[in-house]
Amino acid sequence: MNASFDIAAANYDNSFTHTVIGKLQRNLVYRHLRGILEENRIQNILEINCGTGEDAIWLAKQNYTVTATDISPLMVAVAEKKTNLENLNFRQVDINRLPQPFPDEKFDLIFSNFGGLNCLTKTELGQFLKNASGLLTQNGQLVLVIMPKNTLWEQLYFLAKADFKSVFRRKKENVVANVDGENIKTNYFNPKEVTHLASADFRIRLLKPIGFFIPPSYLEPFFRSRPKLVSVLHSLENTAGKHSFLSKYADHYLITLQKK
């Protein structure tokens, strides 16, 4: 899997991070994440699947101590070139090897953004949640941004293209998703699946849709030249964010779990 994301590393910021849609979705995540950070005593943060380091840098600039990990050495290399913050450390780590790389460390919060966990199978996700519990301090927080199975934007997109076979593709296992020209096996999880897998070690604290009205990033070419439409969708998104039941229909959702 790391080789696939190595290929995506060079173009990821241009294809998502710096796009109109990418910025809007990331700001939605930050708005919810900021509230979580302010309400809890957070000092040490572990980021899983950090990509090119955009979120890790943002967290470190809020004066938290951040360890940011990714399976791809090229993603880590791109991230390291962006900053020299003393309270931020990037490491190449395979999520399936946790907690082995951190034998003597505990974290107040573990964070994974924009579908990094969708690269796991259901069994692997369950094991990750168990391992994450062991890495957290008492009452530690797990903040995950995951892609669900019922994204309405995607279903409408494939209907418009008359690609009826793909309308409900997210309901299948090991769906092949295109990431900057590279095919990645992807699994989609609705909020109830995640809370069920986590129920032995965590209780749910927060659930919010991310991208119910704001479209998926692959529609960036269409929306880039329509700023007024994007502005309207952004306003509607702020309203949608108040309704957790919309989470399984959004492009992503943010779920916060607290260690029992």
Give the ranges of each region predicted by the language model.
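Class I SAM-dependent methyltransferase SAM/SAH-binding core
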Residues: 52-98
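A C-terminal cap/extension of S-adenosyl-L-methionine-dependent methyltransferases
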Residues: 206-260
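Conserved class I S-adenosyl-L-methionine
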Residues: 1-40, 42-51, 58, 143-170
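Short alpha-helix
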Residues: 183-201, 207
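A short glycine-rich, Lys/Arg-flanked "PGG" loop and its adjoining helix->strand segment in the class I
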Residues: 126-138
